[in-house]
Regions:
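A eukaryote-biased signal for short, well-structured alpha-helical docking elements
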Residues: 85, 90-137, 272-313
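Bacterial N-terminal signal peptides
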Residues: 15-27
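N-terminal low-complexity, Pro/Thr/Ser-rich intrinsically disordered segments
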Residues: 42-115
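Bacterial N-terminal signal peptides that target proteins for export
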Residues: 4-17
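Short, flexible helix-coil linker/hinge segments at the edges of structured domains or between repeats
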Residues: 181-210, 214, 256-267
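Signal peptide processing junction and immediate N-terminal pro/mature segment
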Residues: 28-43
Protein backbone atom coordinates (compact mmCIF):
# COMPACT_ATOMS: atom_id res chain seq x y z
CA UNK A 1 0.00 0.00 0.00
CA UNK A 2 1.31 3.43 -0.91
CA UNK A 3 0.53 6.59 1.04
CA UNK A 4 -0.90 8.25 -2.05
CA UNK A 5 -3.43 5.52 -2.79
CA UNK A 6 -6.94 5.52 -1.40
CA UNK A 7 -7.91 2.54 0.73
CA UNK A 8 -11.07 1.10 -0.76
CA UNK A 9 -11.35 -2.28 0.95
CA UNK A 10 -14.86 -2.73 2.41
CA UNK A 11 -14.75 -2.61 6.20
CA UNK A 12 -16.38 -6.01 6.67
CA UNK A 13 -14.20 -7.72 4.09
CA UNK A 14 -11.05 -6.45 5.79
CA UNK A 15 -12.08 -7.92 9.14
CA UNK A 16 -13.17 -11.21 7.58
CA UNK A 17 -9.83 -11.60 5.82
CA UNK A 18 -7.94 -10.81 9.00
CA UNK A 19 -9.78 -13.58 10.84
CA UNK A 20 -8.81 -16.10 8.13
CA UNK A 21 -5.14 -15.08 8.05
CA UNK A 22 -4.26 -14.55 11.70
CA UNK A 23 -0.49 -14.70 12.10
CA UNK A 24 1.15 -14.73 15.48
CA UNK A 25 4.36 -15.32 13.55
CA UNK A 26 4.59 -11.83 12.08
CA UNK A 27 7.40 -11.28 9.61
CA UNK A 28 6.13 -8.41 7.46
CA UNK A 29 8.48 -5.45 6.90
CA UNK A 30 8.11 -2.86 9.65
CA UNK A 31 6.47 0.39 8.59
CA UNK A 32 6.20 1.95 12.04
CA UNK A 33 8.83 2.62 14.68
CA UNK A 34 11.18 -0.32 15.10
CA UNK A 35 10.67 -2.72 18.01
CA UNK A 36 14.10 -1.72 19.31
CA UNK A 37 13.00 1.90 19.57
CA UNK A 38 9.76 0.91 21.26
CA UNK A 39 11.63 -1.21 23.77
CA UNK A 40 13.38 1.94 24.97
CA UNK A 41 10.35 2.92 27.05
CA UNK A 42 11.64 1.43 30.30
CA UNK A 43 10.98 2.83 33.79
CA UNK A 44 13.54 5.12 35.35
CA UNK A 45 15.60 3.64 38.10
CA UNK A 46 14.96 6.17 40.84
CA UNK A 47 11.75 6.43 42.85
CA UNK A 48 11.66 10.18 42.29
CA UNK A 49 11.60 9.71 38.53
CA UNK A 50 8.46 7.58 38.82
CA UNK A 51 6.38 10.36 40.39
CA UNK A 52 4.60 13.18 38.61
CA UNK A 53 5.91 16.43 40.16
CA UNK A 54 2.63 18.31 39.74
CA UNK A 55 0.40 15.67 41.36
CA UNK A 56 2.64 13.21 43.18
CA UNK A 57 0.93 10.32 41.41
CA UNK A 58 2.73 7.40 39.80
CA UNK A 59 4.26 8.21 36.43
CA UNK A 60 3.99 5.40 33.88
CA UNK A 61 6.04 5.44 30.72
CA UNK A 62 2.92 6.38 28.78
CA UNK A 63 3.56 9.91 30.08
CA UNK A 64 6.77 9.95 28.07
CA UNK A 65 5.90 7.78 25.09
CA UNK A 66 2.49 9.32 24.42
CA UNK A 67 2.95 12.93 25.59
CA UNK A 68 4.67 13.81 22.33
CA UNK A 69 1.51 12.94 20.42
CA UNK A 70 -1.03 14.41 22.84
CA UNK A 71 -1.22 17.56 20.75
CA UNK A 72 -1.05 15.75 17.41
CA UNK A 73 -1.60 17.96 14.38
CA UNK A 74 -2.29 17.32 10.72
CA UNK A 75 0.72 17.95 8.48
CA UNK A 76 0.77 17.49 4.71
CA UNK A 77 3.57 15.33 3.41
CA UNK A 78 5.25 15.77 0.05
CA UNK A 79 3.00 13.19 -1.56
CA UNK A 80 -0.17 14.93 -0.45
CA UNK A 81 -1.10 12.33 2.17
CA UNK A 82 -2.00 13.69 5.59
CA UNK A 83 -0.40 12.00 8.59
CA UNK A 84 -0.70 12.52 12.32
CA UNK A 85 2.66 13.77 13.58
CA UNK A 86 3.81 15.42 16.83
CA UNK A 87 4.95 19.01 16.85
CA UNK A 88 8.72 19.15 16.57
CA UNK A 89 9.05 21.10 19.81
CA UNK A 90 7.28 18.34 21.74
CA UNK A 91 9.19 15.34 20.44
CA UNK A 92 10.92 13.38 23.19
CA UNK A 93 14.47 12.06 22.74
CA UNK A 94 14.66 8.31 22.28
CA UNK A 95 16.83 6.46 24.76
CA UNK A 96 19.13 3.68 23.63
CA UNK A 97 17.38 0.31 23.75
CA UNK A 98 18.52 -3.17 24.53
CA UNK A 99 18.57 -5.58 21.59
CA UNK A 100 15.56 -7.88 21.62
CA UNK A 101 16.15 -11.53 20.80
CA UNK A 102 14.98 -12.67 17.37
CA UNK A 103 11.89 -14.38 18.71
CA UNK A 104 10.14 -15.22 21.95
CA UNK A 105 7.28 -17.54 22.80
CA UNK A 106 4.02 -15.85 23.79
CA UNK A 107 1.16 -17.43 25.71
CA UNK A 108 -2.52 -16.50 25.53
CA UNK A 109 -3.51 -14.78 28.77
CA UNK A 110 -6.81 -16.12 30.16
CA UNK A 111 -9.63 -13.59 30.46
CA UNK A 112 -13.30 -13.73 31.41
CA UNK A 113 -15.82 -12.07 29.12
CA UNK A 114 -18.90 -10.09 30.15
CA UNK A 115 -21.28 -8.28 27.78
CA UNK A 116 -23.60 -5.45 28.78
CA UNK A 117 -24.20 -1.76 28.33
CA UNK A 118 -25.58 0.21 25.40
CA UNK A 119 -27.49 -0.95 22.33
CA UNK A 120 -25.43 -0.49 19.15
CA UNK A 121 -26.99 0.76 15.92
CA UNK A 122 -24.39 -0.03 13.27
CA UNK A 123 -24.72 1.57 9.82
CA UNK A 124 -22.19 0.38 7.22
CA UNK A 125 -24.38 -0.98 4.44
CA UNK A 126 -24.52 0.17 1.76
CA UNK A 127 -20.97 1.25 2.54
CA UNK A 128 -20.65 2.96 -0.85
CA UNK A 129 -23.86 4.99 -1.18
CA UNK A 130 -25.01 5.42 -4.78
CA UNK A 131 -28.36 7.08 -4.02
CA UNK A 132 -29.99 9.27 -1.38
CA UNK A 133 -31.99 7.59 1.34
CA UNK A 134 -32.09 6.00 4.78
CA UNK A 135 -28.97 3.93 5.40
CA UNK A 136 -30.23 2.37 8.65
CA UNK A 137 -33.14 2.85 11.04
CA UNK A 138 -34.41 1.46 14.34
CA UNK A 139 -36.32 2.56 17.44
CA UNK A 140 -34.52 2.51 20.80
CA UNK A 141 -34.61 3.86 24.34
CA UNK A 142 -32.02 4.15 27.10
CA UNK A 143 -28.29 3.83 26.43
CA UNK A 144 -27.52 3.85 22.70
CA UNK A 145 -24.40 3.85 20.54
CA UNK A 146 -24.61 4.82 16.86
CA UNK A 147 -21.73 4.06 14.50
CA UNK A 148 -21.94 5.11 10.84
CA UNK A 149 -19.34 4.51 8.12
CA UNK A 150 -20.25 5.49 4.56
CA UNK A 151 -18.67 6.74 1.34
CA UNK A 152 -20.34 9.23 -1.00
CA UNK A 153 -20.25 7.28 -4.27
CA UNK A 154 -22.36 9.86 -6.11
CA UNK A 155 -21.29 12.69 -8.37
CA UNK A 156 -22.69 15.50 -6.19
CA UNK A 157 -21.87 16.73 -2.64
CA UNK A 158 -23.88 15.01 0.09
CA UNK A 159 -24.42 15.09 3.84
CA UNK A 160 -24.76 12.20 6.28
CA UNK A 161 -26.70 12.72 9.51
CA UNK A 162 -28.17 10.81 12.44
CA UNK A 163 -31.75 12.00 12.93
CA UNK A 164 -33.87 11.42 16.05
CA UNK A 165 -37.68 11.40 16.13
CA UNK A 166 -39.37 11.26 19.53
CA UNK A 167 -42.00 8.52 19.29
CA UNK A 168 -42.40 8.23 23.07
CA UNK A 169 -45.15 9.37 25.42
CA UNK A 170 -43.54 12.65 26.46
CA UNK A 171 -40.52 14.93 26.21
CA UNK A 172 -37.21 13.08 26.00
CA UNK A 173 -33.99 14.23 27.59
CA UNK A 174 -31.12 13.21 25.29
CA UNK A 175 -27.61 13.20 26.77
CA UNK A 176 -24.58 12.65 24.54
CA UNK A 177 -21.88 11.21 26.79
CA UNK A 178 -19.18 10.56 24.19
CA UNK A 179 -18.73 11.15 20.48
CA UNK A 180 -16.06 11.11 17.81
CA UNK A 181 -16.01 11.90 14.10
CA UNK A 182 -13.39 12.17 11.41
CA UNK A 183 -13.42 14.96 8.85
CA UNK A 184 -14.72 13.59 5.52
CA UNK A 185 -11.84 12.63 3.25
CA UNK A 186 -10.88 10.13 0.54
CA UNK A 187 -7.96 9.09 2.79
CA UNK A 188 -9.75 6.45 4.84
CA UNK A 189 -7.04 5.78 7.42
CA UNK A 190 -6.87 9.48 8.29
CA UNK A 191 -10.63 9.53 8.83
CA UNK A 192 -10.56 6.36 10.92
CA UNK A 193 -7.78 7.50 13.21
CA UNK A 194 -9.17 11.00 13.68
CA UNK A 195 -12.61 9.61 14.56
CA UNK A 196 -11.15 7.28 17.18
CA UNK A 197 -8.85 9.93 18.65
CA UNK A 198 -11.85 12.24 18.98
CA UNK A 199 -14.02 9.52 20.53
CA UNK A 200 -11.47 8.51 23.17
CA UNK A 201 -10.30 12.03 24.00
CA UNK A 202 -11.56 13.82 27.12
CA UNK A 203 -14.97 15.47 26.62
CA UNK A 204 -17.95 16.79 28.52
CA UNK A 205 -21.52 15.49 28.18
CA UNK A 206 -24.00 17.47 26.06
CA UNK A 207 -27.76 17.56 26.60
CA UNK A 208 -30.87 18.63 24.74
CA UNK A 209 -34.62 18.03 24.97
CA UNK A 210 -36.80 16.51 22.28
CA UNK A 211 -40.54 17.15 22.45
CA UNK A 212 -43.02 14.40 21.62
CA UNK A 213 -43.11 14.04 17.83
CA UNK A 214 -40.15 16.39 17.30
CA UNK A 215 -37.50 15.57 14.70
CA UNK A 216 -33.90 16.86 14.85
CA UNK A 217 -30.33 15.83 14.10
CA UNK A 218 -28.32 14.26 16.90
CA UNK A 219 -25.48 16.77 16.38
CA UNK A 220 -25.95 20.14 14.66
CA UNK A 221 -22.47 19.80 13.13
CA UNK A 222 -23.82 17.08 10.83
CA UNK A 223 -25.89 19.66 8.94
CA UNK A 224 -22.74 21.71 8.28
CA UNK A 225 -20.54 18.81 7.15
CA UNK A 226 -20.42 18.10 3.41
CA UNK A 227 -19.02 15.03 1.67
CA UNK A 228 -17.43 15.56 -1.72
CA UNK A 229 -17.69 12.65 -4.17
CA UNK A 230 -15.42 9.85 -2.95
CA UNK A 231 -15.28 11.09 0.65
CA UNK A 232 -15.67 8.75 3.63
CA UNK A 233 -17.55 9.88 6.74
CA UNK A 234 -17.19 7.94 10.01
CA UNK A 235 -18.56 8.73 13.44
CA UNK A 236 -19.55 7.16 16.75
CA UNK A 237 -22.00 8.66 19.26
CA UNK A 238 -22.94 7.38 22.71
CA UNK A 239 -26.17 8.86 24.05
CA UNK A 240 -29.05 8.21 26.44
CA UNK A 241 -32.71 8.91 25.69
CA UNK A 242 -35.38 8.89 28.38
CA UNK A 243 -38.10 8.21 25.77
CA UNK A 244 -38.35 5.99 22.72
CA UNK A 245 -36.73 7.60 19.70
CA UNK A 246 -36.65 6.50 16.07
CA UNK A 247 -33.03 6.78 14.91
CA UNK A 248 -32.36 7.19 11.18
CA UNK A 249 -28.94 7.41 9.53
CA UNK A 250 -29.44 9.21 6.21
CA UNK A 251 -27.45 10.41 3.21
CA UNK A 252 -29.06 13.36 1.46
CA UNK A 253 -28.41 16.35 -0.84
CA UNK A 254 -26.08 19.00 0.58
CA UNK A 255 -28.62 21.77 -0.06
CA UNK A 256 -31.39 20.18 2.06
CA UNK A 257 -32.03 19.92 5.80
CA UNK A 258 -32.15 16.47 7.37
CA UNK A 259 -35.71 16.72 8.82
CA UNK A 260 -37.07 17.92 5.49
CA UNK A 261 -35.42 15.09 3.55
CA UNK A 262 -36.59 12.47 6.06
CA UNK A 263 -40.26 13.24 5.29
CA UNK A 264 -40.06 11.41 1.95
CA UNK A 265 -36.91 9.28 2.32
CA UNK A 266 -37.01 5.50 1.92
CA UNK A 267 -34.78 2.79 3.35
CA UNK A 268 -31.97 1.78 0.99
CA UNK A 269 -31.27 -1.92 0.43
CA UNK A 270 -28.17 -3.34 2.09
CA UNK A 271 -25.17 -4.30 -0.03
CA UNK A 272 -23.84 -7.85 -0.37
CA UNK A 273 -21.85 -7.68 2.87
CA UNK A 274 -24.94 -6.56 4.82
CA UNK A 275 -22.96 -5.03 7.67
CA UNK A 276 -25.68 -3.11 9.47
CA UNK A 277 -27.94 -3.93 12.34
CA UNK A 278 -28.89 -3.50 15.98
CA UNK A 279 -26.71 -5.23 18.56
CA UNK A 280 -27.74 -5.27 22.24
CA UNK A 281 -25.15 -5.16 25.03
CA UNK A 282 -22.46 -3.42 22.97
CA UNK A 283 -19.95 -3.08 25.83
CA UNK A 284 -17.61 -6.03 26.33
CA UNK A 285 -15.46 -6.43 29.44
CA UNK A 286 -12.42 -8.70 29.23
CA UNK A 287 -11.14 -9.25 32.76
CA UNK A 288 -7.94 -11.20 33.40
CA UNK A 289 -8.46 -14.29 35.52
CA UNK A 290 -5.44 -13.29 37.59
CA UNK A 291 -2.94 -10.46 37.81
CA UNK A 292 0.07 -10.62 35.49
CA UNK A 293 3.48 -10.88 37.20
CA UNK A 294 6.35 -9.93 34.86
CA UNK A 295 8.85 -11.79 37.03
CA UNK A 296 7.14 -15.15 36.45
CA UNK A 297 4.64 -15.02 33.57
CA UNK A 298 6.87 -14.26 30.56
CA UNK A 299 5.29 -12.75 27.43
CA UNK A 300 1.51 -13.02 27.13
CA UNK A 301 -1.17 -11.66 24.82
CA UNK A 302 -4.92 -11.03 24.69
CA UNK A 303 -6.44 -11.33 21.22
CA UNK A 304 -9.22 -8.93 20.23
CA UNK A 305 -11.91 -9.45 17.56
CA UNK A 306 -10.57 -12.70 16.07
CA UNK A 307 -13.95 -14.55 16.21
CA UNK A 308 -12.32 -17.45 18.03
CA UNK A 309 -11.28 -16.44 21.51
CA UNK A 310 -13.26 -13.20 21.08
CA UNK A 311 -16.44 -13.96 19.14
CA UNK A 312 -18.19 -11.55 16.80
CA UNK A 313 -21.55 -10.18 17.96
CA UNK A 314 -24.83 -11.17 16.32
CA UNK A 315 -27.77 -8.83 15.87
CA UNK A 316 -30.86 -8.03 13.82
CA UNK A 317 -31.24 -5.73 10.82
CA UNK A 318 -34.32 -3.83 11.96
CA UNK A 319 -35.17 -2.79 8.39
CA UNK A 320 -35.95 -6.37 7.28
CA UNK A 321 -35.69 -8.58 10.39
CA UNK A 322 -32.72 -10.61 9.15
CA UNK A 323 -30.00 -11.90 11.47
CA UNK A 324 -26.60 -10.28 10.94
CA UNK A 325 -23.04 -10.79 12.14
CA UNK A 326 -20.77 -7.89 13.08
CA UNK A 327 -17.58 -8.94 11.28
CA UNK A 328 -14.88 -7.29 13.38
CA UNK A 329 -17.04 -6.17 16.34
CA UNK A 330 -17.02 -2.59 15.06
CA UNK A 331 -18.79 -0.30 17.51
CA UNK A 332 -18.23 -2.67 20.43
CA UNK A 333 -16.53 -0.82 23.31
CA UNK A 334 -14.02 -3.06 25.09
CA UNK A 335 -13.21 -2.56 28.76
CA UNK A 336 -9.85 -4.28 29.28
CA UNK A 337 -9.12 -5.02 32.94
CA UNK A 338 -5.55 -6.37 32.93
CA UNK A 339 -4.02 -5.89 36.40
CA UNK A 340 -0.34 -6.45 37.13
CA UNK A 341 1.42 -7.46 40.32
CA UNK A 342 4.89 -7.87 41.77
CA UNK A 343 7.82 -5.48 42.17
CA UNK A 344 8.79 -5.29 38.49
CA UNK A 345 7.34 -3.11 35.74
CA UNK A 346 5.22 -4.42 32.86
CA UNK A 347 5.41 -3.17 29.27
CA UNK A 348 2.14 -3.09 27.28
CA UNK A 349 1.92 -3.02 23.48
CA UNK A 350 -0.82 -3.15 20.88
CA UNK A 351 0.07 -5.15 17.76
CA UNK A 352 -1.93 -5.40 14.50
CA UNK A 353 -2.33 -9.03 13.44
CA UNK A 354 -4.80 -8.49 10.57
CA UNK A 355 -3.06 -5.84 8.47
CA UNK A 356 -2.98 -2.06 8.13
CA UNK A 357 -4.18 -0.43 11.36
CA UNK A 358 -4.80 3.16 12.49
CA UNK A 359 -6.59 3.78 15.76
CA UNK A 360 -6.64 5.10 19.29
CA UNK A 361 -7.61 3.93 22.76
CA UNK A 362 -7.75 5.25 26.31
CA UNK A 363 -6.06 4.26 29.56
CA UNK A 364 -7.32 4.91 33.08
CA UNK A 365 -5.10 4.58 36.16
CA UNK A 366 -6.09 4.03 39.82
CA UNK A 367 -4.88 7.56 40.57
CA UNK A 368 -7.63 8.91 38.35
CA UNK A 369 -5.24 9.89 35.57
CA UNK A 370 -6.59 9.21 32.08
CA UNK A 371 -4.80 9.50 28.78
CA UNK A 372 -5.53 9.22 25.07
CA UNK A 373 -3.27 6.68 23.35
CA UNK A 374 -2.70 6.80 19.59
CA UNK A 375 -1.98 3.43 17.96
CA UNK A 376 0.57 3.83 16.55
CA UNK A 377 1.63 7.03 18.35
CA UNK A 378 4.19 8.34 15.87
CA UNK A 379 2.43 8.01 12.50
CA UNK A 380 -1.04 7.45 11.08
CA UNK A 381 -0.92 3.68 10.58
CA UNK A 382 1.20 0.55 10.74
CA UNK A 383 0.83 -3.16 10.01
CA UNK A 384 1.26 -2.88 6.23
CA UNK A 385 1.88 -6.33 4.76
CA UNK A 386 0.58 -8.46 7.60
CA UNK A 387 -2.75 -9.02 5.82
CA UNK A 388 -0.97 -10.72 2.90
CA UNK A 389 0.34 -13.52 5.10
CA UNK A 390 -1.05 -17.01 5.50
CA UNK A 391 -0.71 -19.45 8.35
CA UNK A 392 1.06 -22.75 8.09
CA UNK A 393 -0.67 -25.71 9.67
CA UNK A 394 1.87 -25.70 12.50
CA UNK A 395 1.33 -22.04 13.33
CA UNK A 396 -2.44 -22.50 13.23
CA UNK A 397 -2.23 -25.44 15.63
CA UNK A 398 0.05 -23.46 17.94
CA UNK A 399 -2.34 -20.50 17.95
CA UNK A 400 -5.28 -22.78 18.73
CA UNK A 401 -3.26 -24.05 21.67
CA UNK A 402 -2.69 -20.49 22.90
CA UNK A 403 0.91 -20.10 21.72
CA UNK A 404 2.59 -17.57 19.47
CA UNK A 405 5.94 -16.07 18.61
CA UNK A 406 7.03 -12.50 19.25
CA UNK A 407 9.46 -11.93 16.41
CA UNK A 408 12.00 -9.20 15.85
CA UNK A 409 9.97 -7.72 12.97
CA UNK A 410 6.58 -7.62 14.69
CA UNK A 411 5.17 -4.07 14.72
CA UNK A 412 4.24 -2.78 18.16
CA UNK A 413 2.54 0.37 19.43
CA UNK A 414 3.75 1.35 22.89
CA UNK A 415 0.73 1.86 25.16
CA UNK A 416 2.64 2.27 28.38
CA UNK A 417 4.81 0.76 31.08
CA UNK A 418 3.07 0.11 34.40
CA UNK A 419 3.74 -1.00 37.96
CA UNK A 420 1.36 -2.81 40.30
CA UNK A 421 0.64 0.55 41.95
CA UNK A 422 -0.53 1.99 38.62
CA UNK A 423 -2.38 -0.97 37.12
CA UNK A 424 -4.03 0.17 33.86
CA UNK A 425 -7.63 -0.13 32.67
CA UNK A 426 -7.95 0.28 28.90
CA UNK A 427 -10.86 1.34 26.68
CA UNK A 428 -10.62 -0.02 23.13
CA UNK A 429 -12.88 -0.29 20.10
CA UNK A 430 -12.01 -1.74 16.67
CA UNK A 431 -11.26 1.25 14.41
CA UNK A 432 -13.08 1.71 11.12
CA UNK A 433 -10.87 1.58 7.99
CA UNK A 434 -8.48 -0.77 9.81
CA UNK A 435 -7.89 -4.52 9.75
CA UNK A 436 -8.46 -6.97 12.56
CA UNK A 437 -7.70 -8.79 14.78
CA UNK A 438 -5.35 -6.93 17.11
CA UNK A 439 -3.59 -8.05 20.26
CA UNK A 440 -2.62 -6.54 23.59
CA UNK A 441 0.83 -7.85 24.54
CA UNK A 442 2.24 -7.79 28.09
CA UNK A 443 5.89 -8.48 28.81
CA UNK A 444 8.58 -7.67 31.37
CA UNK A 445 9.91 -4.15 30.89
CA UNK A 446 13.53 -3.86 29.84
CA UNK A 447 15.77 -2.90 32.73
Amino acid sequence: MKFTKKIRIPLARRALFGACALPLLFTAPAAAASPDALQAKAPAGSAAAAVKPETGTALGSLDVSQEATRYAVQAATTNGYSRLVPRASEKQPQAASAKRPLSRVMHAWPVRQEDGGATLLFSDSPEYATQNGILYRDTVQGDVRVLYYHVNQMSMPKKVAVVLENVGAGTSMVTISRSGTGRPSPHYLDVGKEAQASYFDAQKPRRFYLDKGEVRVLDDAMEQTTLAPGDLVYGTYDFHSTQKVRVSVIIYPAYMSAPTFLRFARVLPADDLHLRGTFPQADRTLRAERAYDPAHDGIVYVLLADNESDRYRTGIDATDGSRVLNYGNYGILYHLDLPVQGRNWTQFYLSPFGGTYAGAMRVQLPSGQQRLLLTPPDQTFFGVGSDSMTETAGIERARSAGLGLLTDTMELADIGCYHASSAPFFLFSPPGASNLPAAIIMMPAEK
